[in-house]
Amino acid sequence: MPIGHVFAAGGSIAETPVQRRARTVRHVLALLLLAAAVFLPGLDNYGVYGWQEGQRLLVAQQMDARLRASVTVRDAAEALIVPRVNGLAYVAKPPMIYWAQLLAARATGSSPELWHLRLVVAVSGVLGVLATYFAGRVIFAGALLAGNAVAGFDGVRVDARLADRAALWGAALVGTGTLFVRSGRIGELDMLLALSCTLAIGAAAWSWETWRIAGRASRGGVLMAAASTVAAALCKDPAVMIIGLGGYAGILLYAAVQPGRGGPSRAERFVPPLVAAAAMLVSLRTVEDPADIAGAAIVGALCGALAWVAVRLCAPDRFVPALRALHGVRAWLVLGLGIATSVLWRIGVSRLIGPAEARSLLGQEIDDNLRVLVASAPLNNLWACLIGVGAGSWLAIFGVLWLVRDRPRLPAGWWTLVAWIGLNFCAFSLLGKGVNRYLTPVWPAIALLGGLTLVSLLAAHPARRMPAWIVAATVVALALGQSWYYAAGRGRFYPELSSRDLALELRAMPGLDTSALYSFEFASPGLESYLGRRIVPVGGLRVNIGMSGGPAITLDELSQRVLDTGEALLLVPASIGDELRPGSPIDRLARAGFTLTLRPTTAVFRHSGKAPIALYALTLAGPSEPVNDRTASPAP
C-alpha cells in the first residue's frame, strides 16, 4: 500500500485525492515553519552549555584533526570508527553524531565548531517533528482506512478526520515540548536518536497495518523501518530496545488483551501479584529518601503488569497469532539489522584498540547506565513525563485517565502508541537510573496521545470549545517564546552557564601559559574545545576516565609539577568566603602546601550551575605558611 494512501486517510468521504494531498502539504508546511522557528534561530549565540554538548563537540573536533592527519586508509578508518578524546578511546556512544558534524563542517568548508553541532541537532529536531506527524498519521488514520470510527475520549467518535488532526496537533505539541525543544537546542545526541526511532516506529506501524489489511507487510514500511533502525543503532545503544518495544511489542500487547478460550487462568491471578511484591521488596533496598518508597511501589506495579502480559501470552491462542504477525512484519529482520550494526561497530572498535580495552570501556558504560529496580528511577521518569512535552504532557494525562476509566476497545494499530509510551517507560524505570534525556525518543508518543486528547476534547464540547485559531495561537506563542529564549534570552539571563566567555578571556590574557593550566575536581570539555588543549583535572572527579577525557592527577603530583615548573594555573570552583570555610577547595589546597594568588577575571562561569570558577596561580609554600592573597575573593 503506497504511503500516500495512509497520509490521505485523514479526510472526509467527500474529499478528492487532490484535496487530501493538498491538506497534507499544508500540514507539513505549517509544521516545517513552526519547527524551523523553534530550532534554528541563533544557533551559536550562546556558548557551549554543559558537559554533554562540550563532549560531543570536543570529540568531533579531535576526530576531524585525526582524519586530516591520516596517512593510510587504516588511519582514516580508525579515526572514523573509534571516537577519541585527548587520545583516549571514547566509545560510550556510537559515532553517528560525530560523523554528522564532520559532514556539516565539510559542507561549509571548515572544521567542526559549535554551530555545526547545533545545526545537526536542530535539523534533527525539525525532522523529528515531521516524523511525529508521519507516525501519527500511520498509527491513528491507518487504523481507520476502512472508514470505521473508534470510541475516543469522552464519548467522541474518532473518525478519519479527527485522527488526521490528532497527528497534526501531536506533532505541533512535540515541536513546542519543553524537554524536546531543550534537547534540540543544546547539542544532545538524543535528538538524533528520537528522529531515527520515531521514523522506525512509524514505519513498523505502517508495516503492521498493511499486513493486517492485505496479509502482506508493505515493502516500503519494512525497508524504512530497517534503515531507520540501523541509523538509530549508530546513534545510541538503547535504540534497538526502544524500537523493539515501541514498534513491535504493540503486537504482543494487542494479543495479550484478546479474550481467550476460557476465563482467567490461575497463573493470571497469582503470578502478577507475587512478581509485583518481589520486585517491590528488591527495590526497597535502594531507597535513600522517604519519597522513594512510592517509587518502589511503582516498580512493583510495573513488574506486576509485565508479568500479567507475559502470562497472558503463554496461551497458544494469543502467542501464535502474535508470533505470526511479528514474522509478517519482518520484525526479526529489522531488529536483527539494528543489533548487527551495533555488534559490527563494536567488533571494529575491538580490532582497532584491542579486545581488553574494548571490554573495559564497554563495562564502564554498562556500570554507569544499567541500574536494576532502583526506586527513584520511576519517580524521576514520571516527573520528566509531566514536563517533557509541555502542554502535550498534561493533555496526555487526560488521555491516560480516559484509557483507565473507560477501557475502550482500541484499534490494533493504536496499541503501537500504548507500547511506545508504556513499555519504554517500564524499561527505563526498571533498568535505568531515571535520567530524563533518555526518554527523549518517547516524547513524540506522549505528544501524539496529547494530540488525540485535544481533538477529542474540542469535538466533545462543541458549545464550549475554543476556536481552532486560539489553540493555534497558543502553540505559536510557545514556539516563539522558546525560540527567543534559546536564541537571545538564555544569554541575557544565564550567561554564566557557558564556558565561552571565560575561555575567550583566558586566551586573551597576556603572558598566560595555557599549557600549565589545571582544573580542581572538575572537567570541562567545553573549555577544552575553546582553548584547543586538554585541561588536566586535579583530584577526584566521580566519573570514569572516558568521561573526564583522561586520568586526573593527585595533589602530590600537582605539587611535583609546580616544583618542576615554578608555577601552575588552577581553575577552582570557589565562592565568596571560601577562604574562610574549613574544607572548601581553597582551604584544602592551602593545607596541601600551596600558595594561591587570585588572578582576577571578569567572565563568570559556573560549572554545572554551581560555584563560579576562579583562576589562581599556584606556587609551593611550607605547610604552615598562610595562603597568599587570601583576602581576595573570586567573582560572585
State each model region's role.
Residues L29, L448, L454-Y485:
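Signature aromatic-anchored transmembrane alpha helix within multi-pass, membrane-resident enzymes
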Residues Q55-A89, M96, L103-A107:
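Extracytosolic helix-loop segments that constitute the early lumenal/periplasmic catalytic or substrate-binding loops
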Residues Q55-S70, A227-S228, C235, V240-W414, ...:
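Transmembrane-lumen/periplasm boundary regions of multi-pass, lipid-linked membrane glycan transferases
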Residues V71, L145-R161, A200-M224, T229-A232, ...:
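Membrane-interface transmembrane helices that cradle and orient dolichyl/undecaprenyl
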Residues L117, V138, R182-L193, K236-P238:
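Short acidic/glycine- and proline-prone juxtamembrane loop motifs at membrane-interface regions
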Residues L119-A160, L199:
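Transmembrane-helix motifs of polytopic, lipid-linked glycan transferases
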Residues S183-G184, D190, G432-P462:
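Hydrophobic/aromatic-rich transmembrane helices and adjacent perimembrane loops
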Residues G481-P582, A603-L620:
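Short periplasmic/luminal acceptor-recognition loop of GT-C membrane glycosyltransferases, typified by
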